[in-house]
UniProtKB/Swiss-Prot annotation:
Glycans are attached at N83, N119, N242, N345, N475, N814, N942. This is A disintegrin and metalloproteinase with thrombospondin motifs 3. It comes from Homo sapiens (Human). InterPro entries: ADAMTS/ADAMTS-like, ADAMTS_ADAMTS-like, ADAMTS_CR_2, ADAMTS_CR_3, ADAMTS_spacer1, MetalloPept_cat_dom_sf, Peptidase_M12B, Peptidase_M12B_N. Keywords: Cleavage on pair of basic residues, Disease variant, Disulfide bond, Extracellular matrix, Glycoprotein, Heparin-binding, Hydrolase, Metal-binding, Metalloprotease, Protease, Repeat, Secreted, Signal, Zinc, Zymogen. Residues 1174-1205 are annotated as: Disordered. Residues 551-606, 845-905, 906-965, 966-1014 form the TSP type-1 domain. One of its GO terms (biological process) is collagen catabolic process. The keyword Repressor does not apply. The active site is at E399. Disulfide bonds join C333-C382, C376-C455, C415-C441, C482-C507, C493-C516, C502-C535, C529-C540, C563-C600, C567-C605, C578-C590, C978-C1010, C982-C1015, C993-C999. The precursor is cleaved by a furin endopeptidase. Glycosylated. Can be O-fucosylated by POFUT2 on a serine or a threonine residue found within the consensus sequence C1-X(2)-(S/T)-C2-G of the TSP type-1 repeat domains where C1 and C2 are the first and second cysteine residue of the repeat, respectively. Fucosylated repeats can then be further glycosylated by the addition of a beta-1,3-glucose residue by the glucosyltransferase, B3GALTL. Fucosylation mediates the efficient secretion of ADAMTS family members.
Length: 1205
């Protein structure tokens, strides 16, 4: 192996025969040896083909030649293995075909240009008559059998993208560096059997100036304004996209395919040679595809070639304008859009165009140019890239990243810290880093836009997936289903005939046809059960070709079941069935899951701690045999996280691990390293320390949920003893709750370390009869790591310890000292007492001021300043804590630095859309809009500045609108109350036209009928009292109760005077001013005659005096400002009588202790009558009334009111 220096230059032999027109002809012969002078450090190697174990098979490498090699025999033809030794390392490559790089039907087109002198450099007119034209010279399928991807055997995190079309060529990404490999000479496939020399060089060793990518993209669509005339060309395509759905096969979830048109100009073809350029480009795109498969991206994207076009000389120079990258990109995008297949389902329809050239289209160092977020756009989904070897794959990936929506790291995002580590979207590509990756910002920006790129959802590859029948039993007879259920030979039982063979499937074996078996299940739906019939839902039914599909729908949830554990966090479930309705005839099943779960019994177990997983393993001790022997089974945590919810146990006797062929019980902890996440139906469910599903809360070092270690204390010490006799010798105790426990010997000794559970007496480590050997085991619900190295023992566990443990030694020699050092972390409330055993409490954590961040720049442009922000950091774990932990007088002074030094742009007036008009007509309508003075920034955003910085007049922000006369409208008042108290009546309202007789439409009605409850039609059986004939009482006929009592007398009177005392019901019972004991007994109405309802609150009334029938001591209640004339009283009494909320009482003018008496003897007699008629107790001097649960004693003085006499 020879390490060549920078000065070693390989000879380059080029022989080109050109045609008369200056172009390369068909007979062109090109041999180009690699320009290895560009590489500062490289090695010449001879790769070999090997098998999986790395054993030599042959020197044959190329795909076209491997078929002829008799020695190239592999047990798996889908894999290839090669050995390469370079830079002191052995690379055992494991490769598989990259079947996702070239789409089916992909082609290579060779374009030829016919020229008219003088016009070949005009990139705009090259399609005019008499100018340059081109035609397809030939088309051939794009070869797909020599692109491979893979990794390096036994080295995790590596990737390889290599082609073996002509030797090995491509990229090897190891654990700490990236290498390129390619054959030293091309076209030597037939000479490989003797060994073929290749060049391997580091990517960081490619000699080139730093590549400035800071100006390699367009921000806005207007930057490609020269393509506006393509709007007409692609109008039909947009219409087709909107009116029809693409019928291409849909890719899987989170799987995206960029179907690429690869355009290659003549400069690239000439440099690599027509015979080799296709293989080179295939290798280059294989590397690009692998870059997009890096797991740091977070999204799986395939770069798929659907078409490759090799351009002729004239077309190539017409597209690229030297020194004008914007115009060159415009020409390339125009050309790519013109190559698009109009049929969306065409196999060559592309999503994105990549153009490669070796011409200088921009200033020195510019390697690419692309628009941002142009993916899937018919014009803007394209990139212009300078091809310069395999390292150009990173330029292509970088520019395509812009089209996908990614921006430069550190420009407009906070990922500038990742550029020095080799991020793909770094603005300055120096090729001096070791491993590429996608920054976190690139992943976030991609995920922000990727879901809007519908064109990437197509799957260009054919999949031979069989179409499943709508009913599963169509393809399987009952005999076949019997064979599946019970084994070879079983068929449907014919010993007895069932009424319906679809109820249950019975099977028997020909050796014993009368012995029938069943699994108590029906045959599959669709199983033929008779001629023209099939089984469906347990019934033999006639086949109906026109059966309509019925999608399923979920039924209701059941109640939650019992908890899987009585303590220590269990799980309970509830379920639902897809039966509302059930899916039939191929209908869709119900979406979503059929069960839900929640945590239950999350409190810790009160009794002695027991490991739930260990209990499940112990239950197998009595009946589970492994290798024909019973074992004592201990819990075992599988290293594969996907299998930690499967029950694996470890034999205490042999150490063998056995799978118990079942899942762990729901509520079992997934891992001993995570005390909260649990297994639910075989899946690990993340649970935080707050015992909430999906929570990210974690414990600090001493078990405080969401803590910051401020309550944690570290206890450490050294204990030395010299044994005088054999037998276990106690050294010290470790209390429960201890975490991060470390016990180790200070020096080699013959003694053996042992651990004992103080609560149970069980030996955790090195009990009697056990062999002391290094191992990792589980006990006391935690994982222990016991290690013996050079006769020095150590024991570690993360804990926490659920029980106290005793640390002992097993002496092997007398009078030999044993010295143990221990250290653990515990909560400050559980710190043990410090004694003379040399146990000390470690000092509290120390803190320091550390740079936290930089402040926001004082100016967005034109040169501003930003200052350092310091925070308080704990030294033990470098975690930022509250600033109060650090000494304020030691805080460093802020450091200032310049920022945003780019020149500011001129602010502009920006007016937003007008708001809606405030009126639809009239003379006062106006509308507003927001007008701001904005300054465009270089990152594409704007900032608002003071209006004084904007030039020109400020656009108006308010203007009149809809200033037209409003049409005249009819105005209507409220409807009056019904004219009657029962039966049919009328309501009236006022209708006016403010514009005379010029109102639009018909005049609204001013009178309408009203319907009240039917009047009382009970037959009148005559007056029930002789007092009914008294004229002085005739005014009470309007009261329903009195009218019923004196129906004969009231019916004889044509008109009835209003009652002298009225009071509408108040909003609360206390608003009714009443005291039956203070009223004339002749005027107290029986409550039973006047129903009281609380359904409709009535309006309050004020009291005023009135001189009318009833005497000077009579009072009536009226609405404020109402007229107390007889008509009003008559109308009010009628309304009061028909109201459901009215209660009639009297209000005296004299103080409550006096009684008011009528002046006639007849009225005195009437008082006696009414008192006797109050069967419910209205004459009682103490009455109670219930309303809203309150008891009111009417003997107490009433609420004060203003009374006028």
């Amino acid at each position: 192996m020879v390490l060549l220096s920078l000065w070693l230059i390989a000879a380059a032999l080029v022989e080109v025969r050109t045609s008369a027109d200056g172009q390369a002809g068909n007979e062109e012969m090109v041999q180009i040896d690699l320009p290895i002078k560009r590489y500062r450090e490289y090695e010449l190697v001879t790769p070999v083909s090997t098998n999986l174990e790395g054993r030599y098979l042959s020197h044959t490498l190329s795909a076209s030649h491997k078929k002829r090699s008799a020695r190239d025999v592999s047990s798996n033809p889908e894999q290839l293995f090669f050995n390469i030794t370079a830079f002191g390392k052995d690379f055992h490559l494991r490769l598989k075909p990259n079947t996702q790089l070239v789409a089916p039907g992909a082609v290579v087109e060779w374009h030829e240009t016919s020229l008219v002198p003088g016009n070949i450099t005009d990139p705009i007119n090259n399609h005019q008559p008499g100018s340059a034209t081109y035609r397809i010279r030939r088309t051939e399928p794009l070869q797909t059998n020599c692109a491979y991807v893979g990794d390096i055997v036994d080295i995790p995190g590596t990737s390889v993208a290599i082609s073996n079309c002509d030797g090995l060529a491509g990229m090897i990404k190891s654990d700490n560096e990236e290498y390129f490999i390619e054959p030293l000479e091309r076209g030597k496939q037939m000479e490989e059997e003797k060994g073929r020399i290749h060049v391997v060089y580091k990517r960081s060793a490619v000699e080139q100036a730093p590549i400035d990518m800071s100006k390699d993209f367009h921000y806005r669509e207007s930057d490609l304004e020269g393509l506006d005339d393509l709007g007409t060309v692609y109008g039909n395509i947009h219409q087709q996209l909107n009116e029809t759905m693409r019928r291409r096969r849909h890719a899987g979830e989170n799987d995206y395919n960029i179907e690429v048109l690869l355009g290659v100009d003549d400069s690239v073809v000439r440099f690599h040679g027509k015979e080799h350029v296709q293989n080179y480009l295939l290798t280059l795109m294989n590397i690009v595809n692998e870059i997009y498969h890096d797991e740091s991206l977070g999204v799986h994207i395939n770069v798929v070639l659907v078409r490759m076009i090799m351009l002729g000389y004239a077309k190539s120079i017409s597209l690229i304008e030297r020194g004008n990258p914007s115009r060159s990109l415009e020409n390339v995008c125009r050309w790519a859009s013109q190559q698009q297949r109009s049929d969306l389902n065409h196999s060559e329809h592309h999503d994105h165009a990549i153009f490669l050239t070796r011409q200088d289209f921009g200033p020195a160092g510019m390697q690419g140019y692309a628009p941002v977020t142009g993916m899937c756009h018919p014009v803007r989904s394209c990139t212009l890239n300078h091809e310069d070897g395999f390292s150009s794959a990173f330029v292509v990936a970088h520019e395509t990243g812009h089209v996908l929506g990614m921006e430069h790291d550190g420009q407009g995002n906070r990922c500038g810290d990742e550029t020095a580590m080799g991020s793909v979207m770094a603005p300055l590509v120096q090729a001096a880093f070791h491993r590429y990756h996608w920054s976190r910002c690139s992943g976030q920006e991609l995920k922000r836009y990727i879901h809007s790129y519908d064109c990437l959802l197509d799957d260009p590859f054919d999949h031979d997936w069989p179409k499943l029948p709508e009913l599963p039993g169509i393809n399987y007879s009952m005999d076949e289903q019997c064979r599946f259920d019970f084994g070879v030979g079983y068929k449907m039982c014919t010993a007895f005939r069932t009424f319906d063979p679809c109820k249950q499937l019975w099977c028997s074996h020909p050796d014993n046809p009368y012995f029938c078996k069943t699994k108590k299940g029906p045959p599959l739906d669709g199983t033929e059960c008779a001629a023209g019939k099939w089984c469906y839902k347990g019934h033999c039914m006639w086949k109906n070709a026109n059966q309509q599909k019925q999608d399923g729908n979920w039924g209701s949830w059941t109640k939650f079941g019992s908890c899987s554990r009585t303590c220590g966090t269990g799980v309970r479930f509830r379920t639902r069935q897809c039966n509302n309705p059930m899916p039939i005839n191929g209908g869709q099943d119900c979406p979503g899951v059929n069960f839900e779960y929640q945590l239950c019994n999350t409190e810790e177990c009160q009794k002695h701690f027991e490991d739930f997983r260990a209990q499940q393993c112990q239950q197998r001790n009595s009946h589970f045999e492994y290798q024909n022997t019973k074992h004592h089974w201990l819990p075992y945590e599988h290293p594969d996280p996907k299998k930690r919810c499967h029950l694996y146990c470890q034999s205490k006797e042999t150490g063998d691990v056995a799978y118990m062929k079942q899942l762990v019980h729901d509520g079992t902890h997934c891992s001993y390293k995570d005390p909260y996440s649990i297994c639910v139906r075989g899946e690990c469910v993340k649970v935080g320390c707050d015992k909430e599903i999906g929570s990210n809360k974690v414990e600090d070092k001493c078990g405080v949920c969401g803590g910051d270690n401020s309550h944690c204390r570290t206890v450490k010490g050294t204990f030395t003893r010299t044994p005088r006799k054999l037998g276990y010798l106690k050294m010290f105790d470790i209390p429960p709750g201890a975490r991060h426990v470390l016990i180790q010997e200070d020096e080699a000794s013959p003694h053996i370390l042992a651990i004992k559970n103080q609560a149970t007496g069980h030996y955790i480590l090195n009990g009697k009869g056990e062999e002391a050997k290094s191992r990792t085991f589980i006990d006391l619900g935690v994982e222990w790591d016991y290690n013996i190295e050079d006769d020095i023992e150590s024991l570690h566990t993360d804990g926490p310890l659920h029980d106290p443990v005793i640390v002992l030694i097993i002496p092997q020699e007398n009078d030999t000292r044993s010295s143990l050092t221990y250290k653990y972390i515990i909560h400050e409330d559980s710190v043990p007492t410090i004694n003379s055993n040399n146990v000390i409490q470690e000092e509290l954590d120390t803190f320091e001021w550390a740079l936290k961040s930089w402040s926001q720049c004082s100016k967005p442009c034109g040169g501003g300043f930003q200052y350092t922000k310091y925070g308080c950091r704990r030294k033990s774990d470098n975690k930022m804590v509250h600033r109060s932990f650090c000494e304020a007088n030691k805080k460093p002074k802020p450091i200032r630095r310049m920022c945003n030094i780019q020149e500011c742009t001129h602010p502009l007036w920006v007016a937003e859309e007008w708001e809606h008009c405030t009126k639809t007509c009239g003379s006062s309508g106006y509308q507003l809009r927001t007008v701001r003075c904005l300054q465009p920034l270089l990152d594409g955003t704007n900032r608002s500045v003071h209006s004084k910085y904007c030039m020109g007049d400020r656009p108006e922000s308010r203007r009149p609108c809809n200033r037209v006369p409003c049409p005249a409208q009819w105005k209507t008042g409220p409807w009056s109350e019904c004219s009657v108290t029962c039966g049919e009546g009328t309501e009236v309202r006022q209708v006016l036209c403010r514009a005379g007789d010029h109102c639009d439409g018909e005049k609204p009605e001013s009178v309408r009928a009203c319907q009240l409850p039917p009047c009382n039609d009970e037959p009148c059986l005559g007056d029930k009292s002789i007092f009914c004939q008294m004229e002085v009482l005739a005014r009470y006929c309007s009261i329903p109760g009195y009218n019923k009592l004196c129906c004969e007398s009231c019916s004889k009177r044509s008109s009835t005077l209003p009652p002298p005392y009225l009071l509408e019901a108040a909003e609360t019972h206390d608003d009714v001013i009443s005291n039956p004991s203070d009223l004339p007994r002749s005027l107290v109405m029986p409550t039973s005659l006047v129903p009281y309802h609380s359904e409709t609150p009535a309006k309050k009334m004020s009291l005023s005096s009135i001189s009318s029938v009833g005497g000077p001591n009579a009072y009536a209640a009226f609405r404020p400002n109402s007229k107390p004339d007889g008509a009003n009283l008559r109308q009010r009494s009628a309304q009061q009588a028909g109201s459901k909320t009215v209660r009639l009482v009297t209000v005296p003018s004299s103080p409550p202790t006096k009684r008011v008496h009528l002046s006639s003897a007849s009225q005195m007699a009437a008082a006696s009558f009414f008192a006797a008629s109050d069967s419910i107790g209205a004459s009682s001097q103490a009455r109670t009334s219930k309303k809203d649960g309150k008891i009111i004693d009417n003997r107490r003085p009433t609420r004060s009111s203003t009374l006028e006499r």
